[in-house]
């Protein structure tokens, strides 16, 4: 039987409880789930890539899925190219709302055309729908406490950033 290998990518800057929920749920459907922290040249990161990897790996220890989940990072390549190199059988994406659906439908088309790799979509739980990294960065920049929406270790790192100001 073919091993089921998934790939869930993002910038995770910062990691949210919504991201963790998708990772936990997706890991139940794969023998191996890669979580790729990728650089996005169109975003100005709050945390360097290595720090985001460290925070994600620490947050994953609370989920009891570390035996199935491997965090990887990549600076410059298409997700589908990385997926082919890793032998991925399906890409994992999360949908929070209709805007996500429209964006992901377009990506699905090109990913399928270029590689034939399927995409599996996970709907965000209703209580996690509003969460996204951009909103967390914005709220944090204006001095708001985001600890209810991010893992504890991420909240701690955000407080450290505040102390450096």
UniProtKB/Swiss-Prot annotation:
Q: Which cofactor does it need?
A: Mg(2+)
Cellular location(s): Cytoplasm
Top-rank taxon of the source lineage equals Bacteria
Q: Where does ATP bind?
A: 11-12, 19, 104, 128-134
Enzyme Commission number(s): 2.7.7.3
Which Gene3D superfamilies does the record associate with it? HUPs
User: GO annotations under biological process?
Assistant: coenzyme A biosynthetic process
The record's annotation in InterPro entries points to:
Cyt_trans-like, PPAT, Rossmann-like_a/b/a_fold
Q: Which residues bind substrate?
A: 11, 43, 79, 93
Where exactly is the site Transition state stabilizer? 19
The record ties this protein, via PANTHER family, to:
PHOSPHOPANTETHEINE ADENYLYLTRANSFERASE
How does this protein assemble?
Answer: Homohexamer.
Of which family is this protein a member?
Belongs to the bacterial CoaD family.
Question: By its UniProt entry, which HAMAP family does this protein fall under?
Answer: PPAT_bact (MF_00151)
Task: State its role.
Answer: Reversibly transfers an adenylyl group from ATP to 4'-phosphopantetheine, yielding dephospho-CoA (dPCoA) and pyrophosphate.
The protein, known as: Phosphopantetheine adenylyltransferase
Naturally occurring in which organism (per UniProt): Lactococcus lactis subsp. lactis (strain IL1403) (Streptococcus lactis)
